[in-house]
């Protein structure tokens, strides 16, 4: 079926001669001058059928059959004048067929004539009549459909018609032009011209909005619009084919269409659009600042936005706000004369408005005149609470233990300066004896203490004040959980110590026993019962000596535990240091007559010899602390009850004792030796003194700010000191930095019992009566310009509280990231990583 397209043009066509094979002009009769209606322009070929039949076919098909246009066939345009059927014969038909053959060869020549109509020389005379009829036509658009190559048309002229044939080609410029009076038919496909585009044209796969994974196991990806399978092409390529595709010069602009399983090459416009989006620019051709003018013609109901403005927000609020009511009140008061305004103004106000000032006045004089004294109200006294009542609740009254703790507490740290008491009636209440003193202190505060106002600063992000610390997970290994419990003691375990090789653990308890445990198996291999509670135990830090020192009551005993068999199996160094007779010690003994050395011998000491007890050292007072020198030949003891001579240094190989300090304001509590230098640390209740043993002089004093020191320890490198106190403080000192603490850590809720450094790893820990063991990462750098790094790692809390006592002692394993702890619950616990 031939599909044709009818257009209307009001342009006068140019006439040109078409050469055919016979080189004969086409015979065309002169058209009649009287034309009742304009002729139509259509693309068709006139057949030999009668005119009446042609008219019937045209009218019937125009009203019933919809026109289907073929986008692939080019449209033709024919101009019809008055057709003369008398001059039409069979010879002309043969000539016409020969001309059709020539038209195929000359098609390119016809199209290159800018869409103009080609006529022969004999048609020049009728050109004027035809063009005139075309210009007068108002409805020149006729769309029809013919079933064969020859179409039939009937003109609506009352006069006789004349037959003529004219073959034309419509160019691209003519296709773009659309008649203003074009009439559309009921054909649903009439709008889909070759120039139209839609989003569905590129969509070949018509499976709909379903997951494409459903087609992974098939050889096709879906179906087209006709229901045919779309076989996989691009997705079936292997790596070699994909590599060869990179040779394509347009590979960099080729994208893969997953739905249609094909590759799409992006055009220059697409690349420009993507580049604009990437650079956050507007798309090409878009003007964001184009001028806008609305004439009002676009609104069919003649409603202009100026007359149909949106409702303002103020209409949703109640009539009259507080500010409006206040303004109305003041306005009425001024109008009625109730409020009188000072129209004259203050003196100097005019100069201020003009910007003038006294050039020769003293500097600051103007400010003093205008600056007033800002009065700050006196702070109000705190209102009395339930604890100050004459009949307070039972929970506010102190029991015996709380009363003792209240008396031992510093007055500045007490929650209140009186002891709550309970009376049955108000008449039994005595006179408050501190009333005059409190009133006097109140008066002193009012006229002597400066007053200030605190401005609360709002901080959006309080975390910015915190230091940037590494994550604990990046600082492993460190002890993180409880692994083993050593059970055997019946009372609180006051002290524990680990051997230099990390194989044996010694412990001393209030049940008057000394036990040695094997760390790997938790078996108790040695047990010794003494006369009183064990205060301290300490292994010799030198691994060549198998010596354990134990302090209980006023005695120090030196033990060589029979862990390796009989005494003869001990190392010769151990036997040598214990059996060497004292030499040149007469002067030292004269200086320390209060300290006596005894060799354990005889039948009465047979049980002690079997247990490995070799030497006994008797002191005048109870020994609380014992520490070894790193070489293992010296150790020091501390007896706080002795006063000025509380610190003593013992020489094991010479069996000698000396008191280096003769005067002391406060009793000494703890002593420590430097790990690799002849430096001695002595701590009293609130100050740590550092002495040089070679020069016998004081090097420096460390100001702790602590009220009662309980424990100190020295870093393995010797340049840092850590201290713990009964006032819940832990202080880190950098000896190269200052005599004051580098860091003060207040994280324990009760008294700190022990602080220690790890011998080999950058770890330190502290234990307290609050049942917690805090493990920290403490890195000390060789660079003196870089401060130590302190990072909290883990809080271990597994002990139980007995009589308000918690963890009493802790010690690190010499090689592993393990920590041992002993508590008032008579248990020893091992924490591992």
Swiss-Prot record:
Major location category of this protein: nucleus
Localization annotation: Nucleus, Nucleolus; Nucleus, Nucleoplasm
GO molecular function: ribonucleoprotein complex binding
Keyword entries, A-Z: Nucleus, Repeat, Ribosome biogenesis, rRNA processing, WD repeat
SMART domains for the chain: BOP1NT (SM01035), WD40 (SM00320)
Bias (Polar residues): 182-192, 582-592
UniProt key word Nucleus: yes
GO cellular component: nucleolus; nucleoplasm; PeBoW complex; preribosome, large subunit precursor
UniProt-listed Pfam families: BOP1NT, WD40
SUPFAM superfamilies hit by this protein: WD40 repeat-like
Sequence ranges of Low complexity compositional bias: 36-56, 154-170
Record region (Disordered): 20-202, 568-592
Comp. bias intervals (Acidic residues): 90-111, 136-150, 193-202
Any one of the GO BP annotations: ribosomal large subunit biogenesis
Keyword Mitochondrion appears in the UniProt entry: no
Swiss-Prot/TrEMBL WD repeat ranges: 331-370, 488-527, 529-569, 618-660, 663-701, 704-743, 747-786, 802-833
Role according to the record: Required for maturation of ribosomal RNAs and formation of the large ribosomal subunit.
Family: Belongs to the WD repeat BOP1/ERB1 family.
Official protein name in the record: Ribosome biogenesis protein BOP1 homolog
Lineage: Eukaryota, Amoebozoa, Evosea, Eumycetozoa, Dictyostelia
């Amino acid at each position: 079926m031939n599909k044709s397209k009818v257009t209307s043009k009001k342009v006068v066509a140019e006439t040109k001669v078409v050469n055919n094979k016979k080189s004969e002009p086409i015979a065309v009769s002169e058209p009649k001058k009287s034309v009742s209606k304009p002729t139509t322009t259509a693309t068709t070929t006139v057949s030999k059928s009668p005119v009446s039949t042609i008219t019937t076919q045209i009218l019937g098909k125009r009203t019933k059959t919809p026109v289907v246009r073929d986008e692939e066939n080019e449209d033709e345009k024919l101009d019809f004048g008055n057709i003369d059927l008398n001059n039409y014969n069979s010879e002309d038909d043969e000539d016409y067929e020969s001309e059709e053959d020539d038209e195929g060869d000359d098609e390119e020549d016809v199209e290159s004539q800018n869409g103009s109509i080609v006529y022969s020389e004999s048609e020049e005379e009728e050109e004027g009549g035809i063009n005139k009829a075309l210009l007068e036509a108002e409805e020149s658009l006729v769309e029809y459909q013919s079933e064969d190559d020859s179409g039939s048309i009937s003109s609506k002229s009352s006069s006789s018609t004349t037959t003529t044939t004219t073959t034309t080609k419509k160019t691209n410029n003519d296709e773009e032009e659309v008649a203003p009076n074009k009439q559309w038919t009921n054909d649903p496909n009439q709008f889909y011209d070759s120039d139209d585009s839609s989003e569905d044209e590129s969509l070949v796969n018509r499976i709909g909005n379903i997951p494409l994974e459903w087609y992974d196991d098939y050889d096709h990806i879906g179906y087209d619009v006709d229901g045919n399978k779309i076989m996989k092409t691009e997705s079936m390529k292997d790596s070699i084919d994909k590599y060869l595709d990179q040779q394509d010069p347009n590979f960099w602009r080729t994208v893969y269409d997953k739905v249609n399983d094909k590759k799409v090459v992006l055009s220059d416009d697409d690349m420009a659009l993507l580049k604009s989006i990437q650079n956050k620019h507007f798309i090409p051709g878009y003007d964001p600042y184009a001028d806008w003018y609305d004439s009002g013609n676009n609104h069919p109901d003649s409603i202009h936005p100026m007359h149909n403005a949106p409702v303002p927000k103020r209409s949703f609020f109640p009539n009259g706000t507080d500010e409006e009511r206040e303004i109305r009140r003041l306005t009425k008061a001024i109008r009625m004369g109730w409020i009188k305004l000072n129209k004259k103004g203050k003196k100097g106000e005019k100069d201020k408005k003009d910007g003038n000032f006294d050039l020769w006045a003293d500097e600051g004089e103007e400010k003093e005149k205008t600056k007033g004294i800002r009065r700050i109200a006196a702070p109000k006294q705190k209102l009395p609470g339930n604890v100050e009542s004459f009949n307070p609740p039972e929970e506010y009254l102190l029991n015996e233990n709380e009363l003792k703790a209240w008396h031992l507490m510093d007055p500045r740290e007490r929650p209140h300066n009186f002891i709550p008491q309970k009376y049955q009636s108000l008449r039994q209440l005595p006179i408050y004896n501190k009333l005059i003193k409190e009133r006097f202190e109140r008066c002193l505060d009012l006229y002597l203490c400066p007053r200030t106002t605190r401005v609360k600063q709002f901080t959006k992000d309080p975390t910015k004040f915190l230091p940037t610390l590494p994550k604990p997970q990046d600082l492993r290994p460190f002890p993180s959980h409880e692994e083993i419990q050593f059970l055997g003691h019946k009372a609180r375990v006051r002290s524990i110590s680990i051997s230099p090789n990390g194989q044996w653990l010694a412990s001393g308890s209030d049940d008057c026993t000394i036990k040695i445990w094997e760390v790997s198996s938790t078996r108790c291999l040695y047990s010794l019962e003494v006369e009183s509670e064990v205060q301290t135990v300490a292994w010799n830090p030198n691994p060549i000596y198998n010596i354990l020192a134990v302090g209980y009551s006023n005695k120090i005993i030196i033990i060589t535990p029979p862990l390796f068999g009989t005494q003869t199996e001990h190392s010769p160094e151990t036997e040598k240091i214990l059996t060497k007779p004292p030499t040149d010690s007469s002067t030292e003994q004269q200086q320390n007559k209060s300290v006596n050395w005894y060799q354990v011998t005889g039948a009465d000491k047979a049980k002690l010899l079997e247990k490995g007890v070799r030497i006994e050292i008797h002191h005048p007072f109870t020994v609380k602390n014992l520490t070894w020198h790193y070489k293992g030949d010296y150790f020091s003891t501390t007896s706080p009850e002795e006063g000025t001579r509380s610190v003593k240094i013992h020489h094991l190989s010479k069996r000698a004792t000396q008191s280096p300090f003769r005067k002391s304001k406060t009793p000494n509590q703890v002593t420590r030796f430097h790990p690799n230098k002849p430096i001695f640390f002595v701590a009293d209740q609130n100050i740590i003194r550092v002495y040089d043993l070679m020069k016998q002089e004081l090097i420096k004093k460390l100001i702790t700010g602590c009220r009662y020191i309980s424990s100190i320890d020295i870093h393995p490198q010797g340049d840092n000191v850590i201290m713990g106190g009964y006032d819940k403080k832990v202080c880190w000192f950098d000896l190269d930095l200052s005599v004051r603490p580098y860091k003060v850590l207040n994280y324990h809720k009760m008294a700190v019992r022990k602080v220690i450094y790890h011998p080999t790893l950058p770890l330190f820990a502290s234990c307290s009566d609050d049942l917690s063991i805090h493990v920290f990462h403490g890195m000390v750098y060789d660079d003196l310009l870089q401060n130590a790094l302190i990072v909290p790692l883990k809080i271990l809390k597994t002990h139980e509280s007995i009589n308000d006592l918690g963890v009493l002692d802790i010690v690190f394993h010499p090689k592993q990231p393990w920590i041992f702890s002993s508590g008032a619950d008579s248990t020893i616990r091992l924490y591992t990583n």
